[in-house]
Structure formats: C-alpha cells, structure tokens
Swiss-Prot record:
HAMAP family: Ribosomal_uS3_A. Belongs to the universal ribosomal protein uS3 family. Part of the 30S ribosomal subunit. This is Small ribosomal subunit protein uS3. Keywords: Ribonucleoprotein, Ribosomal protein, RNA-binding, rRNA-binding. SUPFAM superfamilies: Prokaryotic type KH domain (KH-domain type II), Ribosomal protein S3 C-terminal domain. One of its GO terms (biological process) is translation. It holds the Pfam family Ribosomal_S3_C. It comes from Methanosarcina mazei (strain ATCC BAA-159 / DSM 3647 / Goe1 / Go1 / JCM 11833 / OCM 88) (Methanosarcina frisia).
Amino acid sequence: MAIEKKFVNDGYVKASMDEYFAEQLNRAGYGGMELNRTPMGTQIIIYSEKPGMVIGKAGKVIRKLTRDVATKYNLENPQIDAQEVKKPELNAQMMASRLAASIERGWYFRKAGHNTIRAVMNAGALGCEVVISGKLTGARSRVEKFVDGYIKHSGHPVEEVVDEGFAVAIKKLGTLGCKVRIIQPGVVLPDSYKVRESVEIEEPAEKPAEKQVEKPAVAPKKEAAKAKAPAPAAAPEPAPTEEPEVAEPEEAEEAQVEASEDFEEAELIYVEGSEEVRRQVNGVWQHKHESYDYWHPMARVHKEAKE
C-alpha cells in the first residue's frame, strides 16, 4: 500500500470509529476518543460522562465494542479503556450532543445556543463558538452563529488548542447540524502577551543631619601682627595694641564706644601740650581731641581736612 493511501485509510478508520462509538454510547455521554497504535496492539481511550455505562454489567458492553471494532476495522488485539470527563462543559462533543438533544426536545434554537455558550464560559473557557445550520425557521436553510470570548479560526493553533464537536438534531422540517468549538482554559496562544507591571523603588530613609561644631574664629594674620605693634611713644602707659582698619561707618563705632562705657569706667589720661584725652576700654585704646570730639579708636586713620 502506498504511503498516501495508508494515511487516508488511517484517517477514515478513525473518523468511522468515532461515529460508531457516538451512536452506540449516546446515552453514556460520549465525549470523544483517542486511537494509539503500539507494538502490543491498538489502544483506544473513550472519554465519557458515565464510564460505568461504557463498561456495562460485568464488562458486557466493553467486550462487545472490542469484538465489533476488531471485526469491522480489521484491528489486531484492540484494547478499549473508558475514562470519565470531570468537566463536561469543557468537552466540545458532549456540549454538541446536549445542544442537539435540547433542540430535539423543542427548545428554540437561540435559547439553546445561548444556554450552551453561557455554560461553557462559566466553566472557565477562554472562548466558545456555537454554529447551528439547517431549516431553523421557514423553508430555506440558514446558519446561526453564537460566539463569546476568543476563538481561533485558522492556522496551526486551531489543530492544537481548539476542541471541536459535532452532533445532529432531527426535526420535522429536517436535520440540523450543531457544531461547538471551545478553547480550553489555561491555553497559551501564540499571539498572547503579558505587560510587565512597573516596580516602584523605595528611596532609602534620609539620615539625620549631624550637628556641626562651630569652630572658634581665628584672627587674621594682619590683625595679629598689628596687635603686636607697640603704642605711640607719647603715651605714658604701656603701648596700646593697634586694630586694623575698619570699614564700618562711624555711627556704628560710636554706638560700640557708648556701649562699652556702660559696662566699664576707664581711667582718663590727658596728653600734655595738646587737648587729646586717652583711655583704655576692654583692651582697646581710644582717644578724642579737638578735631574729633568723641571717643574713637586710636588706630583709625583720620581724614585730612580740606583747605
């Protein structure tokens, strides 16, 4: 047998076997099958809502299915295993069978379609599509589609992530095809993406400011040099220390001199041969004379009077 004919024959056997099980196990809630060929034989897994009805009393039903499959499809040593479906709402074949049964019982097709969509989405599916085709109302056949969530229609992901089921409802006007397609929860789609959440970095707490120790003010070198300079020769007392030139206004100096008089009474020294009077206040020599009749430091340079 050519390789092409072998693949076609395998597909035909699987599709025909699926229809046979759906017909025989309709009351057991048939939900699909898997066919695996191994060196030990052919393993068939049947998914059902009621696996007890698939096995039958003392295994009577499952032995009958095994004999029929081996004879009809020429399979060597077939082994059938029945497994229960925990969530029938997420099985496309089961929901298609329920939809067809609801329409046969007389439900309006829109009500049956919306109920099927609602049950599937409440079970946690990412998306669901229900297609009902045939003579719904009137003499002409048409197609009604109900969609909720996200559904893939083409490409390779359709074969991997989309579960598809089909059932037939027989009405007086004719037959109706019921197709259900479901995307299971937790499926990672090729076009899905996740946005990273922004992370806020907390800034470290500021340390308390250290107390700054005030350093004692150091007198400039010029002031220290002038402080060591001897007093004028005309003074009978020890040489007074000279202060550097002060750029402050005369009013500030007068206020300083008056303030010093309140705290300390200094001894007055009269210079012979002139109207100059001297005194020492807080280590600073002061004098006053005819030109400047107020107490001021002796180190201050007097401006010459204009002619």
